[in-house]
Amino acid sequence: MSLSLWQQCLARLQDELPATEFSMWIRPLQAELSDNTLALYAPNRFVLDWVRDKYLNNINGLLTSFCGADAPQLRFEVGTKSVTQTPQAAVTSNVAAPAQVAQTQPQRAAPSTRSGWDNVPAPAEPTYRSNVNVKHTFDNFVEGKSNQLARAAARQVADNPGGAYNPLFLYGGTGLGKTHLLHAVGNGIMARKPNAKVVYMHSERFVQDMVKALQNNAIEEFKRYYRSVDALLIDDIQFFANKERSQEEFFHTFNALLEGNQQIILTSDRYPKEINGVEDRLKSRFGWGLTVAIEPPELETRVAILMKKADENDIRLPGEVAFFIAKRLRSNVRELEGALNRVIANANFTGRAITIDFVREALRDLLALQEKLVTIDNIQKTVAEYYKIKVADLLSKRRSRSVARPRQMAMALAKELTNHSLPEIGDAFGGRDHTTVLHACRKIEQLREESHDIKEDFSNLIRTLSS
């Protein structure tokens, strides 16, 4: 028995798990096999607890299937075993950076060449403008299924910057919490190392700084500034589109930071490869570390966000009122918080209690607009156009995959985005039974966890229907 056993486990886990989960939780593990014990080393306690909780049965099952009664005992520890680290070759390129890209990736400096996070020096001139908002922390970020992986990845980076998830690329629609997580990482890093040089900025600020540097003949100072930070957090990287000189400079900055094991975190409103106007060499580098999506929050998370926001404002928000608002406003966190602020302001001005009837009155124009925008008819037309089929196909009895999957998607969206009951949704889809609708909703929920494509389709359609 040898470490090839762990490589076999890796190959199977890669097939069984979504790519993001595999890259985030399994890839960082290091393995050591001795005395019929397979020790798996996690980079920190957070990863160890997560893997043991979520994947212990998967791994034990694979060991038994490969070895039968001779399967080794499994042991988890926090630490590193560099000589037995999970081989990169053990997994295929749909999770790692593509082989042809990996050949061009700059060689990262060995840990011994940079004291880095174990000995962050005192800030030097010029003074670094952190721009990190101290109000945005992990503690006040409401976690749900839609953002669980993104939060976990950000937490990992805050605890171990410059480590396995470098760069970290977060993407999703407007107002879903990407910026909050950027600031939370910055605050987490500086809480651990107060002298760390952490810089947060919008991508347009990088462009503006570069233009000023060119105008003032100070491009070398510009390069030194950005290439000497310990963590660079850039929001809305899609604004680099069609700015060739900015992309050129960021390309070299990116390489320099990666070589120095300095952390990079980027956000965008879309998947890296879908960003138009950005060079392929940059888009490929964006995917070298870990890419995680943030989806629109599900109902339970929307309710939790409203309750937490109300609590922060010392406002008692009845649960049924939070549910009423969350059920009708679905697009993003910013919209939810804006609606709640409006309700609170109206309550303060009028002195009235916050009830469902009061909310209906305070948000009447917003609620009317939402109900006008999202109807089952609109969902059917949007889904049919997205999948390049006819609305009549969605209502038909056809069961081919090319029709059945879009039909299930449309039903799931109708349940998520409208207030119609399951029987009403079934009637709108050719008189189908409510159990068919329930099955469709559960199937799409399952596929969103297993398939990147289905997850992307759902997010894209939600974004289109909510805009």
Swiss-Prot record:
MF terms (GO), sorted A to Z: ATP binding; ATP hydrolysis activity; DNA replication origin binding; lipid binding
Spans annotated as Domain II: 91-130
Location of region: Domain III, AAA+ region: 131-347
Keywords: ATP-binding, Cytoplasm, DNA replication, DNA-binding, Lipid-binding, Nucleotide-binding
Region (Domain I, interacts with DnaA modulators): 1-90
Main location (coarse class): cytoplasm
Residues covered by region (Domain IV, binds dsDNA): 348-467
Residue stretches in coiled coil: none
Pfam family for this entry, one: Bac_DnaA_C
GO biological process: DNA replication initiation; regulation of DNA replication
InterPro entries listed in its UniProt record: AAA+_ATPase (IPR003593), Chromosome_initiator_DnaA (IPR001957), Chromosome_initiator_DnaA-like (IPR020591), Chromosome_initiator_DnaA_CS (IPR018312), DnaA_C (IPR013159), DnaA_dom (IPR013317), DnaA_N_dom (IPR024633), DnaA_N_sf (IPR038454)
Positions with a binding annotation for ATP: 175, 177-179
GO cellular component: cytoplasm; plasma membrane
Keyword DNA-binding found: yes
CDD domains: AAA (cd00009), Bac_DnaA_C (cd06571)
Region (Disordered): 97-119
Residue spans of biased composition, Low complexity class: 97-111
Function, as annotated: Plays an essential role in the initiation and regulation of chromosomal replication. ATP-DnaA binds to the origin of replication (oriC) to initiate formation of the DNA replication initiation complex once per cell cycle. Binds the DnaA box (a 9 base pair repeat at the origin) and separates the double-stranded (ds)DNA. Forms a right-handed helical filament on oriC DNA; dsDNA binds to the exterior of the filament while single-stranded (ss)DNA is stabiized in the filament's interior.
NCBIfam families recorded: DnaA
Comment, domains: Domain I is involved in oligomerization and binding regulators, domain II is flexibile and of varying length in different bacteria, domain III forms the AAA+ region, while domain IV binds dsDNA.
Complex and partners: Oligomerizes as a right-handed, spiral filament on DNA at oriC.
Membership in a protein family: Belongs to the DnaA family.
Name of the protein in question: Chromosomal replication initiator protein DnaA
The gene coding this protein: dnaA
